[in-house]
Amino acid sequence: MAGAIGTFSGLALGPATARADVPTPRAQGWQAVPAPGSTPAAQLRRVDAAGPRLAWAVGEEGRAGPSQGRALAMLWNGSAWTKTDLAHLGHTRLLDVAGTCSAAAWSVGQPVGTGSALLRWDGTTWREATFPGAGETNTRLNSVAVDSERRVWMCGSRGGAAGLLYGDGGGEVWRWLEPLPVASANLYRVVVRSPDEVWVGGDQSNGGGWSGLVARWDGAWTVLPPVAGLRLSIADLHAAGPDDVWAVGTEAGIGGPPGRPGNPALCHWDGTAWTRVEAGFTVGSLGGIAGDAQGRLAWVSGWNYQDQSRSTYLRRDGDAWTVVRGPAGAAPAPYLNDVTSVPGTGGFWSVGMTSPTPAPPTEAYTERLDA
């Protein structure tokens, strides 16, 4: 199991004078990357990369007080983030994104009306796609992933039952799989380990609150025991195998008045039981988890309420976790929602917002770690 938690300051190295024949080294540690063009308040909820010159990030913009915002989608072209046009679609936010190439990506979100929306990127624009349950008030799509055969997996619910929506890579044939055999369950994250093994995370009612939920689909459902907690939701997970699963999330408002920030939850399944591991800080949240190019667990993105001057990460070092801080002065109080690896490199992206409050002047925010 995990050992002691250490700390490391994510300071970047400044420029140095070099001979003309010696390449200037890349900056070390996490670096802020501008994500211009969004209307405050804005945030990026999820990010996915197909390579060093192609990534997508989605969220919302234009929030002001209790009013709903507008969906936000950004595209990385290898040198800059660009806001993509969603004016022809009526959506209040996008919740997740997954892509494979410059002409193929998928996103799920919330329209102005009822139900959930499924969007497809064709290399030029986002367009709505139809699926079983589209437009129904009791249908929700919360997360999307694409496997190595470019088949699309989404988790959510239909008719009050949580489950998976599965589609071929062309987006022509969709079907809901057998419902998850858990009552009062919500699924917030889907992760593909292989085309035949898909994991989901979320929460389930425990009578007085809710516990963390993790399950595996490999042609049939295997539901792991609940992750114990009073009001605990799983935001993301990394499965190295049936007996080696890490899950992250937040236990909401424990030990304080209403509105108190939650507690970060870092949990490990060893095939027999869940173990809660100290996250290195006690008040805040953990939102994203990412493996490296070899599939080994590498990074967790978080938010440390007790020190908001920089972004906060957990880095996996062998059997131990290390707290790593992002760049200084990049944002007033950066809040990270997600982290993902960059295929073909040893790099990573993270996304979120410039402060933990989704109200003006908060803006969309991204950081990158180069190999």
Where are the language model's segments positioned?
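Residue-level hotspots at or immediately adjacent to binding/recognition sites across diverse folds
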Residues: 10, 19-371
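N-terminal export signals
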Residues: 1-17
